[in-house]
């Protein structure tokens, strides 16, 4: 058993931490409140190779694994910049294309993931299907060599910033019964693709959208893997990277909140000479949150290590557990930090209440805590499936 990062991973952690701190939470919040995007941070991280750490070197990437990408997600979040697009683009989309794309799709897309110049967002959720992906109603039908895609998607993050959307659909002849997904790379400027912004109670420069696909015409090579049989394994390939990186973001956010709070409570004095952090009523909840965050962090390391060793099934169990634990720990840490700061906790200036919406959403998306508990009950505890 080894709990140490390699020297290269340590260097990556330090370098990403330094970059994140240079931008910081006030940059993130200012972009969110002015309707902007974190373009400068994304582009700089891309130039420095941090967004492509998990892309193979032959395509210009860092040749690392999910461990490296999780480090990038955690450290940017720990600096107050939790970037959701890291989860959808380099974690989900790049992995799907790397593992299940055709040679031509790898050559075409992976270099853009390697330097961050390409953003591909991910669209699976639908209004009438929700957590039940077997009910997906977005349909792809053949028209000569082309495909025509029609359907609706909801809560899709970052469409306005991306060049492509990776759309999960089903073919016309597989319109009922168990999902046989087909994944398509849809350019965001394709005719027939439109979107409208959802008003969300989350302070973030990354937004969610309703997506409308009305007979979007796509060439044959838009189908990931070039074959309908590639759909299901391609969809599954994205799940572990998604769970693990979103968990890393949660842990980073939890660390950020605890750091803000402990800086404050160590120096704030309202009862004579001792800091409020000397009072166990203030310090213990923070210590409890720190324990939860660190436990989630351990599970992320285990999940990423298993994934990078090619042990996908075990990584799936640990990745789900890590995502659950990190979602709970992040929500606890931010809420506890707000309380420890008192009134200052609710101000924009102290930069913790600004994360309340994001960490609350982290218990719902990209997979809800209940669906993870269903997975654990079924696959770890051997219980009958209820749905
Ligand atoms: C900030 C944010 C960003 C998102 N970004 C994306 C994105 O980029 N791309 C994308 O495709 N989607 C995205 N989503 C959607 C997200 O993945 C879904 O919201 C999530 O999967 C839950 O689906 P739902 O909202 O339809 O909830 P529903 O499926 O309607 O569920 C509602 C509630 O019921 C519970 N529930 C449902 N079924 C069961 C069951 N069998 N057992 C126990 N409990 C159950 C759920 O856990 C949940 O609490 C995003 C959502 C948010 C909030």
Positions of the model-derived regions?
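Helix-loop "lid/cap" segments that line or gate small-molecule binding pockets
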Residues: 91-100
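Short glycine/proline-enriched turns and hinge-like loops at secondary-structure junctions
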Residues: 64, 132-134, 158-162, 177-180, ...
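Flexible, small-/acidic-enriched active-site or ligand-binding loops
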Residues: 135-137, 189-217
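A short, Trp-centered hydrophobic/proline-enriched beta-strand micro-motif
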Residues: 116-124
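A short core secondary-structure module
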Residues: 150-195
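Short Ser/Thr-interspersed hydrophobic loop/turn segments at strand-loop and sheet-helix junctions
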Residues: 49, 72-77, 169, 186-190, ...
């Amino acid at each position: 058993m080894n709990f140490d990062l390699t020297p290269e991973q340590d260097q990556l952690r330090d370098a990403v931490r330094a970059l994140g701190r240079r931008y910081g939470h006030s940059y993130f919040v200012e972009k969110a409140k002015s309707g902007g995007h974190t373009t400068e941070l994304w582009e700089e991280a891309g130039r420095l190779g941090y967004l492509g750490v998990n892309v193979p070197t032959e395509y210009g990437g860092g040749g690392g694994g999910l461990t490296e990408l999780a480090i990038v997600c955690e450290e940017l979040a720990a600096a107050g910049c939790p970037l959701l697009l890291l989860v959808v683009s380099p974690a989900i989309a790049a992995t799907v294309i790397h593992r299940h794309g055709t040679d031509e799709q790898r050559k075409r897309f992976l270099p853009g993931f390697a330097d961050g110049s390409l953003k591909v967002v991910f669209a699976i959720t639908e209004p009438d299907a929700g957590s039940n992906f077997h009910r997906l109603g977005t349909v792809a039908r053949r028209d000569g060599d082309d495909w025509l895609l029609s359907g609706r998607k909801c809560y899709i993050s970052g469409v306005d910033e991306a060049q492509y959307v990776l759309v999960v659909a089903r073919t016309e002849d597989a319109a009922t019964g168990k999902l046989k997904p087909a994944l398509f790379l849809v350019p965001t400027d394709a005719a027939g693709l439109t979107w409208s912004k959802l008003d969300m109670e989350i302070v973030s420069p990354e937004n969610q959208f309703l997506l409308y696909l009305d007979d979007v015409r796509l060439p044959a090579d838009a189908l990931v893997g070039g074959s309908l049989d590639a759909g299901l394994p391609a969809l599954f390939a994205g799940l572990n990277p998604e769970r693990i990186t979103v968990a890393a973001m949660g842990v980073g956010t939890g660390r950020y909140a605890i750091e803000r709070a402990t800086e404050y409570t160590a120096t704030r004095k309202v009862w004579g000479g001792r800091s409020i952090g000397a009072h166990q009523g203030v310090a213990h909840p923070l210590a409890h949150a720190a324990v939860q965050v660190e436990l989630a962090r351990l599970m992320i390391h285990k999940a990423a290590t298993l994934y990078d060793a090619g042990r996908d099934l075990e990584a799936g169990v640990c990745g789900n557990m890590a995502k659950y634990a990190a979602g709970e720990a992040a929500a606890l840490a931010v809420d506890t930090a707000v309380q420890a700061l008192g009134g200052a906790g609710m101000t924009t200036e102290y930069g913790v209440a600004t994360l309340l919406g994001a960490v609350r959403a982290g218990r719902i998306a990209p997979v809800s805590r209940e669906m993870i508990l269903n997975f654990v009950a079924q696959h770890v505890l051997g219980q009958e499936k209820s749905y």
